[in-house]
Amino acid sequence: MLASSCVSTNYLPSRIYLLSPPKTQDHLLIFLPGRRSGIHAFESHGTLDILRSSGIQADCVSVDATLSYYTDRVLVDRLETDVFKKAEITGYKNYWFIGNSLGALGAIFYAQTHPGKIKGIILLGPYLGEGPVPDEIQKSGGLLKWEPNMDPGKDSIQDAWVFLRNCITDSTGNFPTIVFLAGQDDRYHQIHSLVAEALPADRVFWAPSRHDWVAWKAAFSEFLHSETAKKLFSKQTLQQPK
C-alpha cells in the first residue's frame, strides 16, 4: 500500500528544458518521476544530456509529482491545470510521457482520462502494480489473451492494464504508442515481461542492471538513438495515426 506524506498538492511544480531556447519544438516530453525521485532526477542523472545529444527535436518538462499527488488522487487534475494548459498555450503539437517507475502509472492514469491527447508513453522501469492482476495476466498466457474479471472502475491497476492492452492492439491511432525500457534484472522483471512480450520488438529496450538509473539511462540512450525513435519523433509523425 502506498503511504502518503505531508506535502501540499494544491499545485504541481515543474521545470521546462528547451532544446533551443527561446524557440519551442513540436514535441514535448513530460517526465513523471518515480516514488524516490523528484523534479531534478531527469537532469541530475544525465538523462537530459542523452536527450539533447540524440538529435531528437523535443523539449522536456519535469514535474515534481511526489507520492502525495497519487494518494490524494489529484495528479491527473494537477497535470491538466499546471502542465498541459500552459503547454497548449505555447503551441506544442505532440505530447509524450516518460513515466519512470511509479510515474508510469501516473502517465497511464492521465492518458486514460484524456483520450487522443497523448501521442505516446515511454515506460521507463515502470511500476505497474503487484498482486492479483499481473498474476491473472500471467496465468492467462499473456496480456493479449487475458480477460479482466472485474468491471471497469473497480480496480485502478486492472484498468491501467486494460488501457495498456488497448494501446498495444490499437490500429486507429486513438491510443498512445507504448515504448518499453527497463533493466534486465529489475525486481519487477516478471511483470515487465508481460508488457514486453505483447509489444513489437522494436519498441522494447532492455539494459543490464536492476531497478535503477544505470539501467534506465542505458535503455533510454539506446531507444533515442534507434530507428524507432527517429520515426516516432520525425516531422512526418506529427498529429498522424500510429
Cite the ranges covered by each PLM segment:
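Conserved alpha/beta-hydrolase
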Residues: 51-69
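Hydrolase active-site cap/lid region
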Residues: 109-153, 206, 216-218
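Short, surface-exposed "cap/lid" segments of acyl-processing enzymes
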Residues: 9-53
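Alpha/beta-hydrolase active-site loop
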Residues: 70-90, 109
